[in-house]
Structure formats: structure tokens, C-alpha cells
Amino acid sequence: MDGLATGLAILIAGFMAAVAFETNQPGLGWLAIAIIGAGVGFLPYNFRGRKPAVIFLGDGGATFLGFTLACLAVKGNWADHSPIVSFSNPLLIFGVLIYDMIHITVERVATGKVRSIKEWLDYVGKDHLHHRLERALGSRQASVAMICLMTICLGLAALALRDAGTTEAVLLLGQACLIVAMITILEWSGRQKR
């Protein structure tokens, strides 16, 4: 979907850079900024509003961005004072992607579309969040915008964790789970009405 992977990479790298600099990890921050720069240079050719994209990331480009961002998330020490806060930061920043992966896995297993790990890895379908939102909202641009807005909401929660304790981290994760639950309920009820 035009602009989705690039836009998410820019947002996720932006939140990771902000948290990295806040937690005194400038090396990770600068790596994240490099990803932002690459994405900003690529985005005008990949997302052109109602016009079709001129270039695409392809599987290689999207996989590289995802792998690099995941490596930054694993490498980082996102909080010194609480392991829960340190664990919560990447969970919130990557929250939309994690939600999509869990949702489609549960749905594919529950409906019998996949029966083994190999089938799960090989399965390609139009049941990802961006496809579901495109059907619900009526356009690809609206779907991309909605996913980016959800990523911003969860990323802002990650920024709020800077000086948070364990209780605040658990509350922010709980809030994120409730937002995801509301989205799931709305999706499910929309499907039932068709």
C-alpha cells in the first residue's frame, strides 16, 4: 500500500530516536535518524496522494526497514530504572504492527486458514489491518492515515514513559490494550452488520 511501510518506518524511527536521546543512547538515536532521512527522501516518490507511486520498497526494502528497526528496539536500553518501562517502550512504539500480527495469526488459526507454522509463514492474504481499514474507510489513503495516527498515539504514550514508574507503565500498556480492544470490537461489529 503506497506510503504505508515508509510512513510507519519514519514514525517508528522518530519515536525511537526521541526515546534513545532521552535515555542517553545517541548511537541508537543517530541510526534511527538515518532511517528517518532515508524514508523522508523516499516517501515523495512512494506516496503521492491519489496518484500512483513511482517506486516501491518491495519485500527487500520493507524487510530491511523492519529488521533494522527491530534490531534497534532489541539493542536499546529504554529505561534504567524499571525493566517494565524498558520493555513497554518498544511495545508501544511497535504496537500497531504487533496488534496486526497477533490479530491475523489468531484469526487465521481460528478459521482454519493455517494449521502449521509453515502454513502460517507461507500464508499471504488480504486480512492485514491496512486491508481491513481500506474496506471499512473506503480508500487506501484513509487506511494509511488511520494506521499512522494509531502509531502516533501509541508513540506519544512511549514518550510519556520517560520518567514513569512501573505503575504508570502498566497503566499506559493497559490503555493501549483497551484501544486495541475497541478497534477489534469495531471491526468485528462492522463485519457482523454486512
For the regions a protein language model found, what residue spans apply to each?
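Alpha-helical transmembrane segments
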Residues: G3-R194
